[in-house]
Amino acid sequence: MAPATKARTKTNKRKGKAKAPAMTPYSSYGLIKGALISETLQVCQGWDLQGSKRANLNRVRSSNCIGAPTQAWLKQVCTTFSRRFEPTSRDRSLVLAANTAIGQQHWKPLLLWHMANSEPLFGDGLLWAWDVSSAGGDQVQSAQALEWLESTTSQGHHEVDGWSDNTRKRVASGLLKAGADFGLLQGKVKRRFTAYYLADEPLLYVLLECLASNRTTAAALADQRWLWFRLPEQELEHRLLLLHQSRLISYYRAGSVVELKLPADSTDALVQEVWS
């Protein structure tokens, strides 16, 4: 990693809080279709950022660059990608990362970040899994995921009531399978929590994303989305101190004063200037 060259400093009178986004209705589609980790990488690697989403996906369909075994599966992959990502705006850095060696090496956590931000059901499911793990649980089963999913109706997600029993079961299973695909869980029936570790490169990527979507640096560090990667705030700060000691970043905190110097000031810049 290149030495720190750009700075971001925030001084706050009180600790900032992560933004509470407006509630977005859950969709069963994404978790049923799956994470599509390798397929998404292949699509992103051939993506023309100057072209439209339609033109790019038409090219994927005509060339079958992902090696789909059937036209039906190819169509489903393209539809899922179209619903899940916006490559010319919020997910531009993911496309850029797919075309770098570092981005490919750490593809799973990068994709997890973008997918969970795009699909609130997946993001909330990861937070629920964190609650189970932090409460001392060492495994989780589909029945528990189904119980959690059904409980979300009391939190305002009444759309779940409209799903069939089979759809709810498929979503619950899909949530745990996605967790396993991304390395957070292991096993088939009884999914056990893994000793997950977010490497330095994707950690800095996620940090830049959190800084961009929160008003203060303190709020970025307290953002609950770090829990998708099993990184509570205290552990995150310890990781930042280690990066500071390695001179990969500059990190200073004294009460409400937080100062960060990072290798880049955005994820686009990180990928293009540091990873490339």
Residue ranges and their predicted role:
Residues Q186-T267:
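Accessory, usually C-terminal, subdomains that scaffold auxiliary metal cofactors
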Residues T153-N166, V189:
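Inter-helical turn/loop segments and adjacent helix faces that build the functional surface
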Residues V140-H158:
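DNA-recognition alpha helix
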